[in-house]
Amino acid sequence: MNIQITFTDSVRQGTSAKGNPYTFQEGFLHLEDKPFPLQCQFFVESVIPAGSYQVPYRINVNNGRPELAFDFKAMKRA
C-alpha cells in the first residue's frame, strides 16, 4: 500500500542521551477521508528533499498497538 507524503525543509537533528544521532523531518500525510493533509514529524535516516512522494507502508502490531511502518527507501516522487 502507498500513501502520499509531502515533506518540507523543516528538519530537527540531534543526539540522544545514549549518543545516537537522530533526524526528524516535518511532512504532511494526505489521507483519502480527510479534506486537508495532516502535519506530522517523521523519524528519517537522512534528510529527504522537500516535495511530494508516494511512500509504501505497512501496518504492524507492536505490543497490541497498531503502528505504521514507512519504507522511505522505496518511495517515489508523486
UniProtKB/Swiss-Prot annotation:
The keyword Cell membrane does not apply. GO terms for molecular function: DNA binding. Keywords: DNA replication, DNA-binding. It comes from the Viruses. GO terms for biological process: DNA replication. Homodimer. Belongs to the inovirus G5P protein family. Binds to DNA in a highly cooperative manner without pronounced sequence specificity. During synthesis of the single-stranded (progeny) viral DNA, prevents the conversion into the double-stranded replicative form. G5P is displaced by the capsid protein G8P during phage assembly on the inner bacterial membrane. This is DNA-Binding protein G5P. The lineage of its organism: Viruses, Monodnaviria, Loebvirae, Hofneiviricota, Faserviricetes. The gene is V.
